[in-house]
Amino acid sequence: MKGVRKPYDNSYTLSFLLVFFVLILFCPAFSINTLSSTESLRISSNRTLVSPGNNFELGFFRTNSSSRWYLGIWYKKLLDRTYVWVANRDNPLSNAIGTLKISGNNLVLLGHTNKSVWSTNLTRGNERLPVVAELLSNGNFVMRDSSNNDASEYLWQSFDYPTDTLLPEMKLGYDLKTGLNRFLTSWRSSDDPSSGDFSYKLETRSLPEFYLWHGIFPMHRSGPWNGVRFSGIPEDQKLSYMVYNFTENSEEVAYTFRMTNNSIYSRLTLSSEGYFQRLTWNPSIGIWNRFWSSPVDPQCDTYIMCGPYAYCGVNTSPVCNCIQGFNPRNIQQWDQRVWAGGCIRRTRLSCSGDGFTRMKNMKLPETTMAIVDRSIGVKECEKRCLSDCNCTAFANADIRNGGTGCVIWTGRLDDMRNYVAHGQDLYVRLAVADLV
């Protein structure tokens, strides 16, 4: 009958509305993670890129005490906003006018005068192929050819240019093919993302290890990678939801970690106060748990605290101790707890009749001048050390499977300390008269 609404019309309308609202609530189509060459991000539009899985978000932000604007990446799901990457940290936008776009096959951030304040600075042979910028599920912001998803052929990626944070799957260290050195630089302060005073960099001479720098001065040394952890960070214990890896080959020397449970957020960060630390999110109370922080001890973790041929022990008084068979170089200064001069041998080495003292649970000495041979074990390492009159100490390069590889020191021994547990065995060469 004309003008009479049939009962199933209402049912159909209600069903349609229900489906519509469900789509609004749960459909991920509203979270866009790509930027094409015809699009842009503007501060005024309040648009952001959101990674698949909604873990990370890229957009513009300003800190609590500043009117300056930055382009950055943060955790999407956390109410306590935590920034993991900042593009223009040392060249902020002075006001709320800023645009991110693709121009000339480069990502470019423009200010209010349309002048570039940050760019990927790429030079490409073929500029005819369209490019796209994409925020990946792991927080990596990449630029690639629009038809090529191969990670090995990204034109540019934020993971190659970290700020103060190392995320899972990021690499810290050298790409030997390109010469790129990936390192961390702290924020100026907790509310200022500009480059701070501290940096954390890999030193690749001999046996690779990381150094914490305060400007041009080394403050702490990680110790070399021993197959499980860095020998100077014994607090970094194996976790069930995380896998660590250190790669050293002809193409790269780099540290990375990955999560076996991607629902857990964990990161390494260099704080504005100069602490390198492992932080993992605790969702039940909404804070970042600090698993460890390095340096831990203000004395024993300080670079070359005790001078050559001496080691630092937190359970001894004073904390600096000469190695067995050594005496303080300047006993008066030593008694005044001025330890920079270190220690000297009691008895000169004879070369042919020397032996070794075993020091347990040690942070290995600085390795920049050490000799490494990963093909031999500890017994052969001892023989090789004894056959070299310049050898002063030796140790395993890898502590797994009972110990493998050989590290030999032929100069002075610097920056050592001992631990209650999880250190390494170090064998120091002594004259027979000094062996106990």
From Swiss-Prot:
Domain Bulb-type lectin positions: 34-156
PROSITE patterns, per the entry: BULB_LECTIN, PAN
UniProt record, GO biological process: rejection of self pollen
Cysteines joined through disulfide linkages: 381-406, 389-391
Source organism, top-level taxon: Eukaryota
PAN domain sequence ranges: 351-431
Pfam families: B_lectin (PF01453), PAN_2 (PF08276), S_locus_glycop (PF00954)
Glycosylation sites: 46, 64, 114, 121, 245, 261, 390
Database matches in Gene3D superfamilies: Bulb-type lectin domain (2.90.10.10), Hepatocyte Growth Factor (3.50.4.10)
Entry keyword set: Disulfide bond, Glycoprotein, Self-incompatibility, Signal
Tissue expression pattern: Stigma.
Signal peptide range in chain numbering: 1-31
Keyword Secreted recorded: no
Role played: Involved in sporophytic self-incompatibility system (the inability of flowering plants to achieve self-fertilization).
Protein name: S-locus-specific glycoprotein S6
Organism name: Brassica oleracea
Lineage: Eukaryota, Viridiplantae, Streptophyta, Embryophyta, Tracheophyta
UniProt gene name: SLSG
